[in-house]
């Protein structure tokens, strides 16, 4: 608390710092936002929209810095003091129960389209689409051409002939271009509260850490889960998610070993006998007929006939399919006429 040299420090500043410290103690998540570029009208709309989600408190940067540093010293939390290092431009304090990542997304989603000012850096390629501007011929035609747009007169109105990138990403917007974009109603930028940093549980999160690609993040989580799942199954480390697959894999492998080694169980006896029978017929078919009795000859003959019938049936089916395709072709041709 500020108690010394009160004659040199305005009383309202002392009171403001104390009020800020009291506010900072209330939040689970404490964040700093930059609101320098937000017009008064949009700022009021933002405050109305976030009123139920967070508390926004504006003050001077010097007083916010003093409040953070004093509170960090009083609570013996040097990590909290690092939050003050993120202060810049027109900062304000945000107090909320939302985690920093959700807070960042909420503030980004709350930004509104706005005209871009001269001297600003284009956040992405600024494109003016082809089409009528709805404006009658006049001096504005020259302004459009002066800004580099292919402007023409079409049906008594000024029109843009082709889609045109008027400013590339990273380039500075010139005064001429800024005027033209504003007149055309193009709003290539967004205004809102820019999150500078957020503090939670001893960690200061800067905006670059909080800015994540949600789709990529979900894909990474899914990929990690798949890798962990496969590792658990292949290493036979049972978990709630993998126990069923591990048991199925173990059963399949055990059954294969049992069949291959002719180890009879109630689960493999049919497969083993079937395999032995097939092997017996294979050996019998390789032996001469004089080595077989009548029963075995009949079995070998039946198997051979079944194989031949299957081989003859396959080409027949292929011919029928080809015939159907030939019959469908003229019909399809007629269909093209209607």
Curated annotation (Swiss-Prot):
Q: Which terms in the GO cellular component ontology are assigned?
A: cytosolic large ribosomal subunit
Q: Where are stretches of biased composition, namely Basic and acidic residues?
A: 308-318
InterPro entries linked: Ribosomal_protein_uL10, Ribosomal_uL10, Ribosomal_uL10-like_insert, Ribosomal_uL10-like_insert_sf, Ribosomal_uL10-like_sf, Ribosomal_uL10_arc
Name the keywords, alphabetized.
Answer: Ribonucleoprotein, Ribosomal protein, RNA-binding, rRNA-binding
**Gene Ontology molecular function:** large ribosomal subunit rRNA binding; structural constituent of ribosome
Give the highest taxon in the source lineage.
Archaea
Similarity remark? Belongs to the universal ribosomal protein uL10 family.
Supply the name of the protein.
Large ribosomal subunit protein uL10
- What is the organism of origin for this protein? Methanococcus aeolicus (strain ATCC BAA-1280 / DSM 17508 / OCM 812 / Nankai-3)
């Amino acid at each position: 608390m500020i108690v010394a040299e009160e004659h040199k420090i305005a009383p309202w500043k002392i009171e403001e710092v104390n009020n800020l410290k009291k506010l900072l103690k209330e939040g689970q998540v404490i964040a700093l936002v930059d609101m320098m570029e937000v017009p008064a009208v949009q700022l009021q709309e933002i405050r109305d929209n976030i009123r139920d989600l967070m508390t926004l408190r504006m003050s001077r940067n010097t007083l916010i810095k003093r409040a953070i540093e004093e509170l960090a010293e009083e609570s013996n939390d040097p990590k909290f003091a690092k939050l003050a290092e993120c202060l810049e431009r027109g900062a304000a304090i945000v107090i909320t129960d939302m985690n920093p990542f959700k807070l960042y997304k909420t503030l980004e989603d709350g930004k509104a389209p706005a005209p871009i000012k001269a001297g600003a850096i284009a956040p992405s390629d600024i494109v003016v689409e082809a089409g009528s501007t709805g404006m009658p011929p006049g001096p504005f035609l020259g302004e459009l051409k002066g800004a580099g747009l292919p402007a023409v007169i079409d049906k008594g109105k000024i029109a843009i002939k082709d889609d045109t990138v008027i400013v590339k990403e990273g380039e500075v917007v010139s005064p001429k271009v800024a005027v033209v974009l504003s007149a055309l109603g193009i709003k290539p930028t967004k205004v809102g509260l820019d999150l500078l940093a957020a503090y939670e549980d001893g960690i200061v999160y800067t905006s670059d850490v909080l800015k994540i690609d949600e789709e990529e993040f979900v894909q990474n989580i899914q990929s990690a889960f798949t890798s962990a799942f496969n590792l658990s199954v292949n290493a036979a480390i049972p978990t709630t998610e993998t126990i069923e697959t591990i048991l199925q894999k173990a059963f399949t492998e055990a059954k294969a070993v049992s069949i291959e080694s002719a180890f009879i169980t109630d689960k493999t006896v049919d497969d083993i006998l079937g395999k032995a029978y097939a092997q017996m017929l294979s050996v019998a078919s390789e032996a001469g007929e004089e080595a077989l009795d009548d029963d075995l000859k009949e079995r070998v003959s039946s198997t051979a006939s079944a194989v031949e019938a299957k081989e003859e049936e396959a080409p027949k089916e292929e011919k029928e399919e080809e015939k159907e395709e030939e019959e469908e072709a003229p019909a399809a041709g007629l269909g093209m006429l209607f």
